[in-house]
């Protein structure tokens, strides 16, 4: 039986074992999937022992995505662009492939919810690792342009400069947004986890069709509520579909079988 696990600290809250067990049942794959919680500075020892013991693949979450990025023998283009790895796979020759499926999970969920992204004008709020991990997949999906807004404008600009050869991408602080309209706004910050909001003008929602929050809760997140208060016609969604989507992409990297995510999203949401 092929064995997998998710690495993080803390990790007891992770839904990855549930999601991958459901994927395996759906696709008639026989796997074992568990949790691993190394000490904050113990990732390399733990992951080396993990693969030495015969495990096939791992998911990696906070705070170890950069450690996994450095550990991999080879990186996919999307992992290199993200400068972080959330999926490790031991290939038949023994080498370790590092991948990042976060952006693919977001793109798949946005397309599932609202159709193709081709020609859409996007605003990404925040300029941290969550933002960096999704830019290349979004540009590959042929969005018209991406604008990154961040409290510290220079950090947003650095991120835009990094990807400017891949597509039309601009940046600003929260207080000097360009006077353009956005079709889709994605909150890449974790502000909703404690009921907060990004410190950005509500005018961003004027004429926007969609607002997406990367975080998720049992009820609508504070960002989703805010978007609908500002523009009642806007369609909103949280990041649970992204979570399941990135897991499905990892499952495909390992098993070469692509699970159907909608039934799994429904099951996981009922358990929130």
From Swiss-Prot:
Record: residues binding NADP(+): 126-130, 150-155, 214, 239
Domain of life from the UniProt record: Bacteria
UniProt enzyme class: oxidoreductase
Keyword list, A-Z: Amino-acid biosynthesis, Aromatic amino acid biosynthesis, NADP, Oxidoreductase
Active site per UniProt: 65 (proton acceptor)
CDD domains from the UniProt entry: NAD_bind_Shikimate_DH (cd01065)
Pfam family, one: Shikimate_DH
InterPro entries, A to Z: Aminoacid_DH-like_N_sf, NAD(P)-bd_dom_sf, SDH_C, Shikimate_DH, Shikimate_DH-bd_N, Shikimate_DH_fam, Shikm_DH/Glu-tRNA_Rdtase
EC number: 1.1.1.25
Alphabetized Gene3D superfamilies for the sequence: Leucine Dehydrogenase, chain A, domain 1, NAD(P)-binding Rossmann-like Domain
Binding site for shikimate: 14-16, 61, 86, 102, 216
GO CC entries: cytosol
Catalytic activity field: shikimate + NADP(+) = 3-dehydroshikimate + NADPH + H(+)
GO biological process: amino acid biosynthetic process; aromatic amino acid family biosynthetic process; chorismate biosynthetic process; shikimate metabolic process
Metabolic or biological pathway, per its Swiss-Prot or TrEMBL entry: Metabolic intermediate biosynthesis; chorismate biosynthesis; chorismate from D-erythrose 4-phosphate and phosphoenolpyruvate: step 4/7
GO molecular function, one term: shikimate 3-dehydrogenase (NADP+) activity
Cysteine disulfide partners in this protein: none
Function in brief: Involved in the biosynthesis of the chorismate, which leads to the biosynthesis of aromatic amino acids. Catalyzes the reversible NADPH linked reduction of 3-dehydroshikimate (DHSA) to yield shikimate (SA).
Subunit annotation: Homodimer.
Family, as annotated: Belongs to the shikimate dehydrogenase family.
HAMAP family: Shikimate_DH_AroE (MF_00222)
Protein's name in the database: Shikimate dehydrogenase (NADP(+))
Source organism per UniProt: Pseudoalteromonas atlantica (strain T6c / ATCC BAA-1087)
């Amino acid at each position: 039986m092929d064995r997998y696990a998710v690495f993080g600290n803390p990790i007891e809250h992770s839904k990855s074992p549930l999601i991958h067990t459901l994927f395996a049942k759906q696709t008639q794959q026989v796997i074992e999937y568990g949790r691993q919680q190394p000490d904050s500075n113990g990732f390399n020892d733990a992951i080396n022992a993990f693969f030495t013991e015969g495990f096939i693949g791992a998911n990696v979450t906070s705070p170890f995505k950069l450690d996994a990025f450095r550990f991999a023998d080879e990186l996919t283009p999307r992992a290199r662009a993200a400068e972080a790895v959330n999926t490790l796979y031991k290939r038949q020759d023994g080498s370790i492939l590092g991948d990042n499926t976060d952006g693919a999970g977001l793109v798949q969920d946005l397309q599932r919810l609202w159709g193709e992204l081709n020609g859409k004008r996007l605003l990404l709020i925040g300029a941290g690792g969550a933002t960096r991990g999704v830019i290349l997949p979004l540009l590959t999906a042929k969005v018209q342009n991406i604008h990154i807004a961040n409290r510290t404008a220079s950090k947003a600009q650095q991120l835009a400069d990094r990807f400017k050869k891949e597509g039309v991408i601009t940046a600003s602080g929260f207080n000097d947004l360009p006077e353009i309209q956005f079709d889709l706004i994605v909150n890449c910050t974790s502000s909703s986890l404690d009921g907060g909001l990004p410190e950005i003008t509500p005018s961003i929602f004027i004429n926007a069709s969609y607002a997406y929050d990367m975080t998720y809760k049992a009820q609508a997140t504070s960002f989703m509520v805010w978007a609908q208060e500002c523009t009642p016609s806007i369609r909103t969604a949280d990041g649970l579909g992204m979570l399941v989507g990135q897991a499905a992409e990892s499952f495909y990297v390992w098993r070469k079988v692509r699970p159907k995510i909608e039934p799994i999203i429904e099951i996981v949401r009922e358990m929130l």
